[in-house]
Amino acid sequence: MKVVAIQPDVPIAEVERSLVHLEDLIGQAAREHSPDAIFLPESMTTKNVYDRRMREVARPIDGAPLQMLRRAARAHDCVVGGGFIAIRGNDARGTYAVVEPDGTALFHDKDQPSFWENNYYSAGTDDGVIDTSLGTIGIANGFEWGRTRTARRMLGRVRLLAGGMHFPSFPTWKATKPWFWDRDHFALVQYARETPPRMARLLGVPAVHPSHVGDFVMETMLVPGLAWPSLCVGESAICDADGVVLQRLGFDDGEGWVCADVDIDAEPRPRDPMPPGFWNSLLPISVHAVWHVGNVHGRVKYEGMKLLRRHRWQQ
C-alpha cells in the first residue's frame, strides 16, 4: 500500500487560510504519487500552541475541516486523514478524521490533551482503532505516540499506525539557552525522530507519522506578556514494521511530503517488549515539568470557562 505523510508549516489560528493551503498540498502529493492514503498531522488547521487566538479555532465536527478532507478524498480517490479541534457535543476535542473516497468519515478523539492544549479541548474516550476500506488502522494524536497505553490498546488489533504529531520545542530565550536550547532541544529532536520507529516496533506494524514544522511565537503559560519563540521540529516519517525509516522529513527539510510503500497484509508481530511505564521512552525532566504544570493549568481553565460558558464554541 502506498502512503503519504504531509509535513505542513501553517500559521497560528488562521483556519480557513490553512485549509486552502492544505488542500493544495494534498493535491500536489496525490498527483505526484497516486497514493492509497494521505495523512496530515493532528491539529492540521493551526500550530497547536498556547495563544489567545487558539480560542477561535474549534470548528463543528462536520464543518470546514472535514469538508476539505472529503473533497480531497473524492478528488484523488484515496483515503485522507487529518486532525483539528472539533466541537463534539458539549465539549471540544482533539479530533482526527479519516475520510474514504465515498465521503465516509471515521473519527478518533485524543485521549488526553498535552501541556497547554488542555486550555482548548478535553479528553476523548475511544480506543483509536478504526476499520477502513484499507484495513484496520490505529490513530494516534500527538503524545499518544509516546504513551504505552496507546500501544497496549492497539496491540494485535491494527495493521497500520497513523495519525499525526505537533511537536513544539523549548523557547529560545537567551537566559535559558544553555539548558533549554543547547541541551534539551537536542534531546527533544532525537525523541521526535525515534518515536515513529519505536511505536512501529512495539506494535509490529508500519507507521505513518506526519508532523508540523516551522518557527512560531506563542504566549507563555502563567507569565502574561512573555513571548515564547520556538519551532515545531518536524520529523515526519514512514516506517516499516521493523521500525526501519523508509522516508523522513526533518526541520531543515521544511514543508513537504514523503511517500513510501508499506505492507499492511502481514499479521502484527511486535519486535520490542512493551515498556512498563507511562511513557514508552525517556523524556527530559524539563518536559515533565512543563507537562504537569500545563496539564493542571489548562484543565482548571478549560473547566472554569466551560462552567461560565466563556468558550467561543459555547456562544
Predicted regions and their residues:
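Cys-nucleophile CN-hydrolase/nitrilase-fold catalytic domain and related Cys-dependent amidase chemistry
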Residues: V15-E16, V20-P101, L106-H108, P168-V205
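C-terminal beta-strand edge segments of enzyme domains
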Residues: V129, P206-Q315
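Short hydrophobic segments within beta-strands
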Residues: I6, V99, A140, V208-P210, ...
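CN hydrolase (nitrilase-like) catalytic-core segments centered on the catalytic cysteine
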Residues: I61-G81, W145-G256
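Active-site catalytic loop in hydrolytic enzyme cores
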Residues: I61, I87-E194, D252, P273-P276
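Active-site micro-motifs of SAM-dependent methyltransferase domains
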Residues: V10, T45-T46, R147
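Short polar catalytic/cofactor-binding loops
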Residues: Q7-A13
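Extreme N-terminal starter segment of soluble prokaryotic enzymes
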Residues: M1-A5
